[in-house]
Design a protein with these regions (language model features):
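Gly/Pro/Ser/Thr-rich low-complexity, intrinsically disordered segments predominantly at protein N-termini
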Residues: 1-190
Length: 190
């Protein structure tokens, strides 16, 4: 290998309120696994339906000053899908939290998604196996539920009452007949 050859890497970035923001270093295995698991769940469910699941890497254009790259999105209005990305608010957006994007995902992006009319927004925390589900209410994305996949050792220490309160699956607000299992979202992590 020639040491004089420079390694060129694609730099992932977003445009937030007109400001170019470099995204975290390349996503971790767990980050990608979670995004893939969520995408696969929706992609399988939506086969043959009007809405489509769109994986990480697709640009999302919401305003003249905002170009984002969410980890996964659902778009039901196919007119919003163009050759270079999605133009307009998706119906569901998913962000898997990373140290470098955490603040923007919870702050500016959540506010922007509210203003643009995103119906549902998920924030997923890989380290704690937690999913926050936000729903649009009166023009604001409000926390609806927080779901947590408990490890076996914690479940073993719970009494019957605590175990009865543990949620292992939930529904997306867009689809009454789709039951999403937390163990599927957080499957095969290291």
């Amino acid at each position: 290998m020639n040491d004089n050859l420079a390694r060129v890497e694609y730099q992932r970035n977003e445009l937030l309120n007109g400001r170019l923001v470099m995204m975290s270093p390349r996503p971790t295995y767990n980050h990608n696994r979670i995004a893939s698991n969520i995408f696969r769940t929706f992609d399988n469910y939506l086969a043959g339906k009007n809405c489509t699941a769109i994986a990480d890497g697709t640009d999302l254009y919401l305003t003249e000053k905002d170009r984002l790259v969410p980890d996964m999105m659902i778009v039901c209005d196919r007119n919003k899908i163009k050759y270079n990305g999605v133009h307009g608010a998706p119906d569901l957006l998913v962000e898997v939290l990373s140290p470098g994007t955490y603040k923007n995902d919870r702050g500016y992006k959540k506010d922007l998604y509210s203003k643009c009319g995103v119906h549902e927004y998920w924030l997923v925390e890989p380290a704690s196996c937690t999913l926050e589900q936000y729903l649009l209410e009166n023009g604001q994305l409000e926390i609806a539920e927080i779901y947590h996949l408990y490890p076996d050792y914690m479940l073993a220490d719970m009494d019957e009452k605590e175990l009865a309160e543990v949620v292992t699956e939930f529904k997306c607000s867009l689809y009454d007949d789709l039951l999403i299992k937390l163990e599927d979202i957080f499957a095969n992590l290291i």
